[in-house]
């Protein structure tokens, strides 16, 4: 089963919490912990990772806190997941930096694995943080061959 780690899930919740509020508002770790109903040490750890990965900005001072480094519509789900988990790859041979797989030379499905990885990555890159804070609707449509294809539509009507 492909599953995001718990900290990645919490990172998505945290980023969504920040994105829901006014862009000029700064958020303290304590306020975010309360808003997300997560332990303060967990939120502090998440903030450190997301800040280090360039998704958050830190503002010092008595009225300091954290804000998004970019507008929510410019931060993809893929970026957040990669910040928390590392490079997006379903298998070792899907890593862009090279494979650690012992079967690489004889693998019959390596090329297909890479294509599947690209499709999954593309789907995650198409969902933006701004989409996470609005309800998504699953829509079934037919392609040119008549096959049912599912897609999503945001509350604003943008198809993905």
Name each model feature, range by range.
Residues 95-160:
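C-terminal regulatory/oligomerization modules of transcriptional regulators
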């Amino acid at each position: 089963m492909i599953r995001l780690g718990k900290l990645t899930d919490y990172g998505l919740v945290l980023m969504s919490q920040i994105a829901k509020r006014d862009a000029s508002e700064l958020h303290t770790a304590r306020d975010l912990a309360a808003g997300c109903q997560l332990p303060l040490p967990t939120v502090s750890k998440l903030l450190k990772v997301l800040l280090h990965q360039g998704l958050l900005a830190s503002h010092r001072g008595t009225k300091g806190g954290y804000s998004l480094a970019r507008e929510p519509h410019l931060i993809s789900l893929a970026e957040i997941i990669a910040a928390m988990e590392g490079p997006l790859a379903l298998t070792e041979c899907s890593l862009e930096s090279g494979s650690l797989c012992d079967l690489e030379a004889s693998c019959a499905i390596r090329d297909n694995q890479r294509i599947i990885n690209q499709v999954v990555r593309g789907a995650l890159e198409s969902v933006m943080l701004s989409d996470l804070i609005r309800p998504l609707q699953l829509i079934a449509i037919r392609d040119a061959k008549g096959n049912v294809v599912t897609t999503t539509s945001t509350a604003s009507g943008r198809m993905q």
